[in-house]
Amino acid sequence: MSTIAKDQTQINEKIRAKELRLIGQDGEQIGVKSKREALEMAERVDLDLVVVAPNAKPPVARIMDYGKYKFEQQKKEKEMKKKQKVINVKELRLSPTIEEHDFQTKLKNGRKFLSKGDKCKVSIRFRGRAITHKEIGQRVLEKFADECKDIATVEQKPKMEGRQMFIMLAPINEK
């Protein structure tokens, strides 16, 4: 059972390979050297020997400042996280017999979610015998989608799932 963390970079004495393809501090390729020779070269210039491609044959190692390298990696990771946008799905529950004022309140909430960039799942739960009038629920969902068409697109048309009917709305991207 391996207990190596995903960020366990092989540096200096922790390098397991006997031979390494060595790259100098300014990026020039030095060639294939033994681990001992490579470590001596790194120590001469007061830098670390870091394996950058452990799966290559032989592994590729570079003479560099490990602290600086680690900092750059963390910086890149942070930038990648910033670029990722987490899309939340907000759900609004309606009933097929919803009154106009209640509908407008739910619509206002839905528009708020969509304007923030979240997807919106609008669902209608049919209770008892109301399931026999699915067309009423479908009209309510279509009305909701129609009221939001200026800020959202229908990602999934009204669909029945058990005793629920739902529609998915996604915000329109302004790029």
UniProtKB/Swiss-Prot annotation:
Pfam families: IF3_C, IF3_N. One of its GO terms (biological process) is ribosome disassembly. PROSITE patterns: IF3. The keyword ATP-binding does not apply. One of its GO terms (molecular function) is translation initiation factor activity. GO terms for cellular component: cytosol; membrane. Keywords: Cytoplasm, Initiation factor, Protein biosynthesis. It is found in: Cytoplasm. Its main location: cytoplasm. InterPro entries: T_IF-3_C_sf, T_IF-3_N_sf, Translation_initiation_fac3_CS, Translation_initiation_fac_3, Translation_initiation_fac_3_C, Translation_initiation_fac_3_N. Monomer. IF-3 binds to the 30S ribosomal subunit and shifts the equilibrium between 70S ribosomes and their 50S and 30S subunits in favor of the free subunits, thus enhancing the availability of 30S subunits on which protein synthesis initiation begins. Belongs to the IF-3 family. This is Translation initiation factor IF-3. It comes from Staphylococcus epidermidis (strain ATCC 35984 / DSM 28319 / BCRC 17069 / CCUG 31568 / BM 3577 / RP62A). The gene is infC.
